Amino acid sequence: MAEVACQTVGWRFATVEDREVITAMVADAAEQASLRLTPPELATSPAKFRRPDGTSVFRPKHSTVFSSDSLLAAEDHLLQRARTATGPTIDLTTVGTITSKADSEGRVLGPDQAAALASVAVPGRVVDVLVGPAGAGKTAAMNAPRRAWETEHGAGSVVGLAPSAVAAQVLADDLRIATENTAKWWTTHQHTGVTFKAGQLVIIDEASLAETLSLNRITLAAEEAGTKVLLVGDYAQLPSVDAGGAFSLLIHDRHDAPELVDVHRFTHAWEKTASLELRHGRTPVIDTYLAQDRIHDGDAEAVTAAAYTAWRHDRQQGLSLI
């Protein structure tokens, strides 16, 4: 209903009632054309346990899940590509060299980053994944396959994509590769025919934010070109605003999906552990943040003022800030 209301907000109706009727009709038509994934209620709840609209109070409101033939087909295609080992690979000797040597900034790969490189570079999956929690050295982990690919396939053999222009620019700055946002790349591909090259590695950052149909289209183009796609992200972070979930689907389809586990961002050891606990939704970690005086309360005005004061102080000190 919310999506229908959004799509019809510019339409004019004689009365509010007319708008509500049309909204309901469009929503009903969309429901009829969709595939219902949530099973129906097999038992009727007593009247005192039913809402005014007749639904059971034992089932959350608006919790029915729908899909479509095209979306399910896209998921199947992505799973198949993730199980297909016909993509370009890197020699194990090159992987060993990259693992043992520091990069241009003097960074040496940690054990989890080195394992991730071997998992991504050697098997030859057409679509591969890398899970990188916040602060776990994702940039260094992505830089490793870039170095390996350019060693064997030459300059320009690694390109980047991301669901947003901002994320694409960050990826370009971090890895020093050509990048584009996924929507722009697909539009250019449709109008000009420009596509990937055989042997390339395509890194799609913030992959949990990418919609499933978009990933399916891009990975199909990559498969046809003889290119490997590496999806990098964190399934525990924000999902796509469109029909998404493909990244999480691919992660949980494997028992050996590479995941970075060593958090580098924080100075204090307790905060490294706590950030991962919070990521997994383990509520007891809130006590840790309370004990470390990291949780403060107040009304909206007081909290806003405190945040601004802290921001201004850090800025005056020349510190990095949001």
Where are these regions (language model features)?
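Short loop/turn elements that form and flank the Walker-type P-loop nucleotide-binding site
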Residues: P123-G124, A155, F196-A198, E223-G226, ...
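Substrate-engagement module of ASCE P-loop NTPases
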Residues: A222-L231, Y235
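Conserved helicase motor core of P-loop NTPases
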Residues: H77, T86, A115-A116, V232-I322
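Conserved RecA-like ASCE P-loop NTPase motor core of nucleic-acid helicases/translocases
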Residues: D128-A172, V229-V232, L260, R294-D297, ...
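Conserved P-loop NTPase motor core of helicases/translocases
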Residues: T151-A221, L249-H252, V261-D297
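Conserved Walker B
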Residues: A134, E206-A210, Y235-A236
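Beta->alpha loop/short-helix hinge microenvironment recognizer with preference
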Residues: M1-V126, V131-A136, A140-E152, A165, ...
